[in-house]
From Swiss-Prot:
GO cellular component terms listed in the entry, alphabetical order: cytoplasm; ribosome
Highest taxon of source: Bacteria
GO biological process: ribosomal small subunit biogenesis; rRNA processing
Chief location bin: cytoplasm
Annotated compartments: Cytoplasm
Protein name listed in UniProt: Ribosome maturation factor RimM
Similarity section: Belongs to the RimM family.
Organism from which the protein derives: Burkholderia mallei (strain NCTC 10229)
Keyword field: Chaperone, Cytoplasm, Ribosome biogenesis, rRNA processing
GN (gene name): rimM
InterPro entries in the cross-refs: PRC_barrel-like_sf, PRC_RimM, RimM, RimM_N, RimM_N_sf, Transl_B-barrel_sf
UniProt domain comment: The PRC barrel domain binds ribosomal protein uS19.
Gene Ontology MF: a single term: ribosome binding
Subunit structure: Binds ribosomal protein uS19.
Record-annotated membrane-spanning stretches: none
Length: 230
């Protein structure tokens, strides 16, 4: 079986998923040495642009405060319980709200219904949490949970070339779609309209083993059993 997992970089209007495997949520213990109610001035700090990680991937957004003790509620772009895994695993978050960027060390994170709730160290009350509302949340790609050999995060698939087994170029993966059963590659390619003008064509290829024969990340391509005239 081959499963595609959303990284959180897919189009935001959809509700994509990390894949078919739901992992058990992990609740982290508070960081050693942290004291309840004490504000760590470095915990939520203004972050210099040069310290933003090169492999940062947007995985969610702060939508509200949760409770009275500084917890925040988040919407995972990929859906909590699956896409929310990156939010649950990563201890270091980078937050962007407008032009301001902040770094947060997360002491606890867990699933709550269809959302993720978390406690950033230094967020001591509801007002502190509300100040983070609307922030986009990024984590390092390197902090994503490890996958099985036949699973792939969407962020690693988007941008790859798609060719068929005869070597015919079919385009590039522009986006991934979740139809509720499996992932679908949205492949774009240069085409010509009826008026003779250039346009962008589109192919929708299911990301399942019957069509996807190889994912060659080192070569930057996906090999499929698919014809150009389908």
């Amino acid at each position: 079986m081959m499963a595609g997992h959303d990284s959180g970089n897919a189009k935001r209007g959809r509700s994509p998923s990390f894949g078919v495997f739901v992992r058990k949520p992990v609740e982290r213990a508070p960081a050693k040495g942290a004291s309840d109610g004490a504000v760590d001035s470095q915990a939520i700090r203004i972050d210099a642009a040069q310290s933003w990680p090169d492999d940062a991937v947007e995985v969610g957004a702060v939508v509200d405060a949760y409770g009275l003790k500084g917890w925040v509620k988040l919407a995972a772009h990929a859906g909590a319980g699956r896409g929310g895994d990156a939010l649950l695993k990563a201890r270091d978050w980078w937050l962007q709200k407008g032009a301001e960027r902040k770094f947060a060390r997360v002491t606890q994170a867990k699933l709550h219904g269809d959302t993720v709730v978390a406690h950033p160290d230094g967020s001591v009350d509801r007002d502190t949490a509300l100040a983070l509302r609307g922030a986009r949340v990024f984590v390092r790609r390197g902090d994503f949970p490890a996958l099985a050999a036949d699973e792939f995060y969407w962020v690693d698939l988007i941008g790859l070339d798609v060719v068929n087994e005869a070597g015919v170029a079919l385009g590039k993966i522009a986006d991934m779609i979740d139809n509720g059963v499996h992932s679908i590659m949205r492949v774009e390619y240069p085409a010509t309209g009826k008026d003779g003008r250039p346009k962008t064509g589109e192919r929708l290829i299911p990301f399942v083993g019957v069509y996807v024969k190889a994912v060659e990340q080192a070569a930057g391509r996906v090999v499929v059993d698919w014809e150009a005239d389908y």
